[in-house]
Each structure stands twice: as structure tokens, then as C-alpha cells.
Amino acid sequence: MKVTLIAILTCAAVLVLHTTAAEELEAEGQLMEVGMPDTELAAVDEERLFECSVSCEIEKEGNKDCKKKKCKGGWKCKFNMCVKV
């Protein structure tokens, strides 16, 4: 009985803390809304495209064969750009 009561009170406390934290983030405008574009991920995508093509161009200028830079995290370098696999 005591264990069940402790578990219920712990869950209630966690729920209250989680809800309070979510309300604070929402008030600060840091929570994403459904359908809202993820600008940070878009910026990462642009960085990956730029990073791969610049790396390849630098290697070409050095009179070397262009070795495409490896893209990590589910990305592949193709035509001097990192593309999602």
C-alpha cells in the first residue's frame, strides 16, 4: 500500500513539474507549434550543402582528384552536395 501511494505521489509531482516547465517555455516562445517550420534544421541542411561543395572545390583547385567529403548522420555527398539518404 505504501509503495503504491509513493508511486502515485511521485507521478503527480513529476506531472506538475513537467507542466510548469512546459508553460514557462511556452510563455518564452521556445516551444514549437504544429506546422511551424523548423528553421534550425533548415539552417543545418544549408550548412551541409555548402560544406560539402566547398570542400570538393578546394580539393579540385589543388590539382587533386575530388574526394567527396563524408557526410554523417544519414547524409550522403552527391554531386558536391550532402543529400539526405
Swiss-Prot record:
Q: Does the keyword Secreted apply?
A: yes
Identify the keywords attached in UniProt to this record, alphabetized.
Disulfide bond, Neurotoxin, Postsynaptic neurotoxin, Secreted, Signal, Toxin
GO molecular-function term, one example from the UniProt record: toxin activity
The record's principal subcellular location, in a coarse class, is secreted
Record's keyword annotation contains Signal: yes
Region forming the signal peptide: 1-22
Q: Name one Pfam family in it.
A: Toxin_20
Its tissue distribution reads:
Expressed by the venom gland.
Q: Which GO terms describe its cellular component?
A: extracellular region; host cell postsynaptic membrane
Here the disulfide bonds are 52-66, 56-77, 71-82
Propeptide positions: 23-48
Q: Where in the cell is it found?
A: Secreted
Q: Could you identify this protein by its name?
A: U4-theraphotoxin-Hhn1a
